From Swiss-Prot:
Function: SNARE involved in targeting and fusion of ER-derived transport vesicles with the Golgi complex as well as Golgi-derived retrograde transport vesicles with the ER.
Its membrane topology: Single-pass type IV membrane protein
Protein name: Vesicle-trafficking protein SEC22b-B
Subunit record text: Component of 2 distinct SNARE complexes.
Domain Longin: from-to ranges: 6-119
Cytoplasmic side: 1-190
Organism of this sequence: Danio rerio (Zebrafish)
Gene Ontology cellular component annotations, sorted alphabetically: endoplasmic reticulum membrane; endoplasmic reticulum-Golgi intermediate compartment membrane; ER to Golgi transport vesicle membrane; Golgi membrane; melanosome; SNARE complex
Keywords: Coiled coil, Endoplasmic reticulum, ER-Golgi transport, Golgi apparatus, Membrane, Protein transport, Transmembrane, Transmembrane helix, Transport
Metal-binding keyword on record: no
Domain v-SNARE coiled-coil homology: residue ranges: 134-194
GO BP of this protein: endoplasmic reticulum to Golgi vesicle-mediated transport; protein transport; retrograde vesicle-mediated transport, Golgi to endoplasmic reticulum; vesicle fusion with Golgi apparatus
Length: 215
């Protein structure tokens, strides 16, 4: 189930729109998660992964960053990740169409709170049983959900390590892997040249031997 949806400006973490589960008891339970979401918005930056899943006990945060805006949803841990990211991409497309040009100019929190109407409408369509049955038909061409980075929300917030740092570590590992492959290729090339050179020297010595000793 989709329990909380928030949209914020990436540059400063300013909340732009939000929609929370309407049930009052559930709403009180979600205050902690809403606070975590706001902390997360303040940590994100342009170097952060543009798609990420953050585990939070029995819940999971999923977010998408596009065109300077972060779209975040809180779901029960068992809610399909593919469905969650398809939902966020749907919101992203509509929000950018309606408010994209105004995002850099606003200064008040929740300046686009009226977008809640579209959020509620979209949320219902994604939690509908028919939508869940048709999960395999949802268009997720822009991303492979199996390769989206997964982290723990408490570790990220308590450790004080920006998600960009986690992304940098992944990039460093990738760079080291590429360097290893490059070095291995270079060494293999040198080995091949050395073998050819040794063969050439042997051939020349054989010719010299035949010429001076047999001719």
């Amino acid at each position: 189930m989709v329990l909380l949806t928030m949209i914020a400006r990436l540059a400063d973490g300013l909340p732009l729109a939000a929609s929370m589960q309407e049930d009052e008891q559930m709403g009180r339970d979600l205050q902690q998660y809403q606070s975590q979401a706001k902390q997360l918005f303040r940590k994100l930056n342009e170097q952060s992964p543009n798609r990420c899943t953050l585990e939070a006990g029995s819940m999971s945060f999923h977010y998408v960053i596009e065109k300077g805006v972060c779209y975040l949803v809180l779901c029960e841990a068992g809610f399909p990740k593919k469905l969650a990211f398809a939902y966020l991409e749907d919101l992203q497309a509509e929000f950018h169409e309606q408010h994209g040009k105004k995002v850099p100019t606003v200064s008040r929190p929740y300046s686009f709170i009226e977008f809640d109407t579209y959020i509620q409408k979209t949320k219902k369509s994604y939690i509908d049983s028919r939508a869940r049955r048709n999960l395999s038909n949802i268009n997720t061409e822009l991303q492979d959900v199996q390769r989206i980075m997964v982290a723990n929300i408490e570790e990220v917030l308590q450790r004080g390590e920006a998600l960009s740092a986690l992304d940098s570590k992944a990039s460093n590992l990738s760079s080291l892997s590429k360097k290893y492959r490059s070095d291995a290729k270079y060494l293999n090339t040198r080995s091949t040249y050395a073998k050819l050179a040794a063969g050439g020297v042997f051939f020349i010595m054989l010719i010299v031997y035949i010429r001076f000793w047999w001719l």
